Regions:
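Short, surface-exposed loop/helix-turn segments at secondary-structure junctions
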Residues: 102-110
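Short beta-strand edge/turn micro-motifs at domain boundaries
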Residues: 89-91, 113-138
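Short, low-complexity N-terminal intrinsically disordered segments enriched in polar/charged residues
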Residues: 1-25, 29, 33, 37
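Transmembrane beta-barrel outer-membrane domains
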Residues: 14, 70-72, 109-111
Length: 138
């Protein structure tokens, strides 16, 4: 027999992986509605100069992506997640490529590598970010 608690943890980890992938999609598509839905109403985000709520972050980062870049592409790499009931914490490595607008000739691409340090909460069966902090490693 399979342990139901183990199954719950494995399902939670997959749902959290889907959540972090949806975050990348929301940023890269500048989809503020999608991105905002990934954050708990009481969430907090620290990313670059931004320090505020998840909802405010969703609006601000999508406006930046639409106006400053011709494209962005975030790719999650390995992820560590520790689940504890309806809460979890994790670290996800990410590589992001961005192309600024207004370049002549061969465009310059910005490549960034770092980690997201996250806390997650499950409410009514849905995982959301309660805390997300980006650490730029290079």
């Amino acid at each position: 027999m399979t342990d139901p608690a183990l199954i719950d943890v494995l399902v939670a980890k997959q749902q959290i992986a889907d959540l972090t992938a949806a975050y990348c999609r929301g940023v890269d598509r500048a989809d503020a509605a999608l991105l905002g839905s990934l954050f708990h109403p009481d969430s907090h985000v620290e990313s670059g100069p931004f320090n505020g709520s998840g909802q405010d972050f969703a609006r601000e980062i999508c406006a930046i992506v639409r106006t400053v870049f011709t494209q962005t592409s975030h790719a999650n790499a390995h992820q560590w997640v520790e689940v504890d009931g309806d809460s979890a914490k994790g670290e996800t490595y990410v590589t992001a490529l961005a192309t600024p607008r207004g370049q002549e000739g061969d465009p310059v691409h910005m490549l960034t590598g770092g980690r997201y340090l996250d806390r997650f909460v499950r409410t009514n069966g849905t995982w959301q970010f309660i805390e997300r902090r980006f650490v730029c490693d290079w």
